[in-house]
Curated annotation (Swiss-Prot):
Record lineage: Bacteria, Pseudomonadati, Pseudomonadota, Gammaproteobacteria, Enterobacterales
Reactions catalysed according to its record: L-aspartate 4-semialdehyde + pyruvate = (2S,4S)-4-hydroxy-2,3,4,5-tetrahydrodipicolinate + H2O + H(+)
Cellular localisation: Cytoplasm
UniProt-listed PROSITE patterns: DHDPS_1, DHDPS_2
Residue numbers binding pyruvate: T45, I204
EC numbers, comma separated: 4.3.3.7
Functional description taken from the UniProt entry: Catalyzes the condensation of (S)-aspartate-beta-semialdehyde [(S)-ASA] and pyruvate to 4-hydroxy-tetrahydrodipicolinate (HTPA).
GO cellular component: cytosol
InterPro entries recorded: Aldolase_TIM (IPR013785), DapA (IPR005263), DapA-like (IPR002220), Schiff_base-form_aldolases_AS (IPR020625), Schiff_base-form_aldolases_CS (IPR020624)
Protein name in the entry: 4-hydroxy-tetrahydrodipicolinate synthase
Family: Belongs to the DapA family.
UniProt keyword Cytoplasm present: yes
Active site (record annotation): Y133 (proton donor/acceptor), K161 (schiff-base intermediate with substrate)
Amino acid sequence: MFTGSIVALVTPMDDKGNVDRASLRKLVDYHVASGTSAIVAVGTTGESATLSHDEHVNVVLQTLELADGRIPVIAGAGANATAEAIALTECFNHCGVVGCLSVTPYYNKPTQEGLYQHFRAIASCTDLPQILYNVPSRTGCDMLPETVARLAQINNIIAIKEATGNLSRVGQIQDLVNDDRFILLSGDDASALDFMCLGGKGVISVTANVAARQMAEMCRLTLAGDVHAARRLNQSLMPLHRDLFIEANPIPVKWATKVLGLIATDTLRLPLTPLSASARPAVERALQHAGVL
Protein backbone atom coordinates (compact mmCIF):
# COMPACT_ATOMS: atom_id res chain seq x y z
CA MET A 1 0.00 0.00 0.00
CA PHE A 2 3.03 2.30 0.38
CA THR A 3 4.33 1.59 -3.12
CA GLY A 4 3.38 2.51 -6.68
CA SER A 5 1.20 5.49 -7.58
CA ILE A 6 -0.30 7.10 -4.50
CA VAL A 7 -2.48 10.08 -5.35
CA ALA A 8 -2.23 13.36 -3.44
CA LEU A 9 -5.96 13.93 -3.79
CA VAL A 10 -7.56 17.32 -4.41
CA THR A 11 -10.34 18.33 -2.02
CA PRO A 12 -13.41 19.11 -4.17
CA MET A 13 -15.50 22.08 -3.10
CA ASP A 14 -18.79 23.59 -4.19
CA ASP A 15 -19.23 27.21 -5.29
CA LYS A 16 -19.46 28.30 -1.65
CA GLY A 17 -16.23 26.58 -0.66
CA ASN A 18 -17.83 23.69 1.18
CA VAL A 19 -16.61 20.13 0.65
CA ASP A 20 -18.45 18.54 -2.29
CA ARG A 21 -19.19 14.96 -1.25
CA ALA A 22 -20.60 13.91 -4.63
CA SER A 23 -17.39 14.95 -6.38
CA LEU A 24 -15.30 13.31 -3.67
CA ARG A 25 -17.17 10.06 -4.30
CA LYS A 26 -16.46 10.37 -8.04
CA LEU A 27 -12.76 10.91 -7.35
CA VAL A 28 -12.49 7.92 -5.05
CA ASP A 29 -14.30 5.70 -7.55
CA TYR A 30 -11.99 6.93 -10.33
CA HIS A 31 -8.89 5.94 -8.38
CA VAL A 32 -10.27 2.57 -7.40
CA ALA A 33 -11.04 1.84 -11.06
CA SER A 34 -7.68 3.17 -12.28
CA GLY A 35 -5.41 1.06 -10.09
CA THR A 36 -4.11 3.81 -7.82
CA SER A 37 -2.27 2.19 -4.89
CA ALA A 38 -3.56 4.52 -2.17
CA ILE A 39 -5.08 7.95 -1.55
CA VAL A 40 -3.52 10.72 0.51
CA ALA A 41 -6.42 12.79 1.84
CA VAL A 42 -5.82 16.42 2.84
CA GLY A 43 -2.18 16.84 2.04
CA THR A 44 -0.79 19.93 0.34
CA THR A 45 -2.78 19.19 -2.82
CA GLY A 46 -5.88 18.73 -0.66
CA GLU A 47 -5.57 22.31 0.65
CA SER A 48 -4.74 21.32 4.20
CA ALA A 49 -3.44 24.81 4.96
CA THR A 50 -6.85 26.45 4.41
CA LEU A 51 -9.10 23.88 6.08
CA SER A 52 -10.03 24.16 9.74
CA HIS A 53 -9.08 21.34 12.11
CA ASP A 54 -12.62 19.96 12.06
CA GLU A 55 -12.89 20.23 8.26
CA HIS A 56 -9.54 18.51 7.86
CA VAL A 57 -10.60 15.55 9.98
CA ASN A 58 -14.01 15.41 8.31
CA VAL A 59 -12.58 15.20 4.79
CA VAL A 60 -10.31 12.33 5.80
CA LEU A 61 -13.23 10.50 7.42
CA GLN A 62 -15.46 11.09 4.39
CA THR A 63 -12.74 9.77 2.09
CA LEU A 64 -12.43 6.66 4.25
CA GLU A 65 -16.18 6.14 4.21
CA LEU A 66 -16.39 6.50 0.43
CA ALA A 67 -13.37 4.25 -0.10
CA ASP A 68 -15.15 1.57 1.94
CA GLY A 69 -12.10 -0.67 2.08
CA ARG A 70 -11.57 -0.63 -1.69
CA ILE A 71 -8.40 1.47 -1.56
CA PRO A 72 -6.11 2.38 1.35
CA VAL A 73 -6.36 5.93 2.70
CA ILE A 74 -3.43 7.84 4.19
CA ALA A 75 -4.29 10.88 6.30
CA GLY A 76 -2.46 14.13 5.79
CA ALA A 77 -1.68 15.16 9.36
CA GLY A 78 1.06 17.76 9.16
CA ALA A 79 1.14 21.17 10.82
CA ASN A 80 3.77 23.74 11.67
CA ALA A 81 2.91 23.48 15.38
CA THR A 82 3.82 20.14 16.93
CA ALA A 83 0.78 20.23 19.21
CA GLU A 84 -1.59 20.61 16.24
CA ALA A 85 0.15 17.83 14.30
CA ILE A 86 -0.27 15.57 17.33
CA ALA A 87 -3.93 16.57 17.70
CA LEU A 88 -4.60 15.71 14.06
CA THR A 89 -2.73 12.43 14.25
CA GLU A 90 -4.60 11.38 17.38
CA CYS A 91 -7.90 11.93 15.54
CA PHE A 92 -6.90 9.24 13.06
CA ASN A 93 -5.66 6.62 15.53
CA HIS A 94 -8.61 4.24 15.28
CA CYS A 95 -10.57 5.35 12.22
CA GLY A 96 -9.15 3.01 9.59
CA VAL A 97 -6.44 5.01 7.82
CA VAL A 98 -3.33 2.98 7.04
CA GLY A 99 -0.93 5.73 8.02
CA CYS A 100 -0.28 9.46 8.26
CA LEU A 101 1.73 11.83 6.08
CA SER A 102 3.34 14.62 8.07
CA VAL A 103 5.10 17.55 6.43
CA THR A 104 8.05 19.37 7.93
CA PRO A 105 6.88 22.46 9.83
CA TYR A 106 6.52 25.40 7.48
CA TYR A 107 7.34 29.09 7.98
CA ASN A 108 8.90 28.78 11.46
CA LYS A 109 12.09 27.10 10.08
CA PRO A 110 13.14 24.72 12.87
CA THR A 111 16.67 23.39 13.20
CA GLN A 112 17.47 19.77 12.38
CA GLU A 113 17.18 18.97 16.08
CA GLY A 114 13.80 20.69 16.14
CA LEU A 115 12.67 18.55 13.21
CA TYR A 116 13.81 15.42 14.99
CA GLN A 117 11.98 16.35 18.19
CA HIS A 118 8.85 17.32 16.22
CA PHE A 119 8.52 14.01 14.39
CA ARG A 120 9.55 11.96 17.41
CA ALA A 121 6.77 13.59 19.43
CA ILE A 122 4.20 12.84 16.71
CA ALA A 123 5.32 9.22 16.39
CA SER A 124 5.05 8.74 20.15
CA CYS A 125 1.32 9.58 20.15
CA THR A 126 0.29 6.81 17.75
CA ASP A 127 0.95 3.31 16.53
CA LEU A 128 0.02 4.32 12.97
CA PRO A 129 2.78 4.17 10.35
CA GLN A 130 4.23 7.63 9.80
CA ILE A 131 5.47 9.01 6.47
CA LEU A 132 7.80 11.99 6.71
CA TYR A 133 7.35 14.67 4.06
CA ASN A 134 10.20 16.91 2.95
CA VAL A 135 9.29 19.70 0.52
CA PRO A 136 11.62 22.66 1.19
CA SER A 137 10.38 24.65 -1.81
CA ARG A 138 7.10 25.11 0.06
CA THR A 139 8.11 24.95 3.71
CA GLY A 140 11.38 26.88 3.74
CA CYS A 141 12.83 23.97 5.70
CA ASP A 142 14.97 21.11 4.36
CA MET A 143 15.17 17.92 6.41
CA LEU A 144 18.65 16.55 5.80
CA PRO A 145 19.40 12.86 5.20
CA GLU A 146 21.17 12.62 8.57
CA THR A 147 17.96 13.68 10.33
CA VAL A 148 15.91 11.24 8.27
CA ALA A 149 18.28 8.46 9.33
CA ARG A 150 17.82 9.34 13.01
CA LEU A 151 14.04 9.34 12.62
CA ALA A 152 14.07 6.05 10.70
CA GLN A 153 15.22 4.36 13.91
CA ILE A 154 11.77 5.03 15.41
CA ASN A 155 9.65 1.93 14.82
CA ASN A 156 6.55 3.52 13.31
CA ILE A 157 8.36 6.04 11.08
CA ILE A 158 8.39 3.85 8.01
CA ALA A 159 8.83 6.10 4.96
CA ILE A 160 9.63 9.52 3.56
CA LYS A 161 8.07 11.49 0.75
CA GLU A 162 11.12 13.24 -0.70
CA ALA A 163 10.03 16.21 -2.80
CA THR A 164 13.28 18.10 -3.30
CA GLY A 165 13.64 16.71 -6.83
CA ASN A 166 17.29 16.04 -5.92
CA LEU A 167 17.90 12.45 -6.99
CA SER A 168 21.14 12.22 -5.02
CA ARG A 169 19.01 12.22 -1.87
CA VAL A 170 17.87 8.66 -2.64
CA GLY A 171 21.33 7.17 -2.27
CA GLN A 172 22.24 9.43 0.64
CA ILE A 173 19.20 8.37 2.65
CA GLN A 174 19.60 4.70 1.73
CA ASP A 175 23.25 4.69 2.82
CA LEU A 176 22.54 6.40 6.13
CA VAL A 177 19.38 4.46 7.01
CA ASN A 178 20.79 1.10 5.85
CA ASP A 179 17.45 -0.65 6.30
CA ASP A 180 15.50 -1.95 3.31
CA ARG A 181 12.27 -1.73 5.31
CA PHE A 182 12.40 2.08 5.21
CA ILE A 183 10.44 3.22 2.15
CA LEU A 184 11.45 6.11 -0.10
CA LEU A 185 8.64 7.75 -2.06
CA SER A 186 9.11 10.50 -4.61
CA GLY A 187 7.18 13.70 -4.12
CA ASP A 188 8.12 15.06 -7.55
CA ASP A 189 6.25 13.62 -10.54
CA ALA A 190 8.82 14.76 -13.10
CA SER A 191 11.68 12.80 -11.50
CA ALA A 192 9.64 9.94 -10.03
CA LEU A 193 10.67 7.36 -12.64
CA ASP A 194 14.38 7.97 -12.06
CA PHE A 195 13.76 8.10 -8.30
CA MET A 196 12.30 4.58 -8.48
CA CYS A 197 15.16 3.36 -10.66
CA LEU A 198 17.51 4.38 -7.84
CA GLY A 199 15.58 2.43 -5.22
CA GLY A 200 12.43 4.39 -4.48
CA LYS A 201 9.21 2.42 -4.19
CA GLY A 202 6.70 4.82 -5.69
CA VAL A 203 5.42 8.38 -5.87
CA ILE A 204 2.88 10.48 -4.03
CA SER A 205 1.56 12.10 -7.16
CA VAL A 206 -0.23 15.25 -8.25
CA THR A 207 -0.40 14.05 -11.86
CA ALA A 208 -2.36 10.97 -10.77
CA ASN A 209 -5.36 13.20 -10.07
CA VAL A 210 -5.93 13.46 -13.82
CA ALA A 211 -3.92 10.55 -15.26
CA ALA A 212 -4.41 7.88 -12.63
CA ARG A 213 -4.25 4.83 -14.88
CA GLN A 214 -1.13 6.08 -16.67
CA MET A 215 0.68 6.89 -13.43
CA ALA A 216 -0.21 3.51 -11.93
CA GLU A 217 1.07 1.74 -15.04
CA MET A 218 4.25 3.81 -15.21
CA CYS A 219 5.03 2.88 -11.61
CA ARG A 220 4.19 -0.78 -12.20
CA LEU A 221 6.47 -0.98 -15.22
CA THR A 222 9.34 0.79 -13.47
CA LEU A 223 9.17 -1.33 -10.34
CA ALA A 224 8.96 -4.47 -12.50
CA GLY A 225 12.18 -3.45 -14.28
CA ASP A 226 10.64 -2.60 -17.66
CA VAL A 227 12.17 0.85 -17.65
CA HIS A 228 12.09 1.30 -21.44
CA ALA A 229 8.30 0.91 -21.54
CA ALA A 230 7.95 3.06 -18.44
CA ARG A 231 9.96 5.87 -20.04
CA ARG A 232 7.89 5.72 -23.19
CA LEU A 233 4.71 6.09 -21.15
CA ASN A 234 6.23 8.78 -18.95
CA GLN A 235 7.13 10.88 -21.99
CA SER A 236 3.42 11.35 -22.64
CA LEU A 237 3.03 12.59 -19.07
CA MET A 238 5.96 15.01 -18.93
CA PRO A 239 3.96 18.08 -20.04
CA LEU A 240 1.49 17.33 -17.23
CA HIS A 241 4.30 16.89 -14.70
CA ARG A 242 5.49 20.36 -15.74
CA ASP A 243 2.32 22.32 -16.38
CA LEU A 244 0.39 21.15 -13.33
CA PHE A 245 2.84 23.47 -11.55
CA ILE A 246 2.51 26.40 -13.96
CA GLU A 247 0.89 28.14 -11.00
CA ALA A 248 1.04 27.06 -7.37
CA ASN A 249 -0.26 23.56 -6.65
CA PRO A 250 -3.17 22.74 -6.42
CA ILE A 251 -4.45 25.57 -8.64
CA PRO A 252 -3.72 23.93 -12.04
CA VAL A 253 -4.62 20.37 -11.05
CA LYS A 254 -7.95 21.47 -9.62
CA TRP A 255 -8.83 23.19 -12.89
CA ALA A 256 -7.69 20.12 -14.85
CA THR A 257 -9.73 17.79 -12.66
CA LYS A 258 -12.79 19.93 -13.31
CA VAL A 259 -12.14 19.94 -17.07
CA LEU A 260 -12.14 16.13 -17.01
CA GLY A 261 -15.49 16.15 -15.24
CA LEU A 262 -14.18 14.51 -12.09
CA ILE A 263 -15.20 17.43 -9.88
CA ALA A 264 -17.97 19.98 -10.32
CA THR A 265 -16.01 23.20 -9.73
CA ASP A 266 -12.42 24.36 -9.42
CA THR A 267 -13.24 26.42 -6.33
CA LEU A 268 -10.30 26.97 -3.99
CA ARG A 269 -10.03 28.61 -0.59
CA LEU A 270 -8.44 32.04 -0.50
CA PRO A 271 -5.66 33.06 -0.76
CA LEU A 272 -5.61 30.55 -3.64
CA THR A 273 -7.56 31.64 -6.71
CA PRO A 274 -8.58 29.71 -9.85
CA LEU A 275 -6.15 29.10 -12.69
CA SER A 276 -5.57 32.22 -14.76
CA ALA A 277 -6.98 32.28 -18.28
CA SER A 278 -3.49 32.68 -19.75
CA ALA A 279 -2.29 29.42 -18.16
CA ARG A 280 -5.25 27.28 -19.18
CA PRO A 281 -4.17 26.48 -22.77
CA ALA A 282 -0.88 24.95 -21.56
CA VAL A 283 -2.65 22.69 -19.08
CA GLU A 284 -5.25 21.73 -21.69
CA ARG A 285 -2.50 20.81 -24.17
CA ALA A 286 -0.78 18.73 -21.50
CA LEU A 287 -4.00 16.82 -20.84
CA GLN A 288 -4.35 16.17 -24.56
CA HIS A 289 -0.73 15.06 -24.85
CA ALA A 290 -1.33 12.54 -22.07
CA GLY A 291 -4.39 11.22 -23.88
CA VAL A 292 -6.82 11.97 -21.08
CA LEU A 293 -8.70 14.80 -22.83
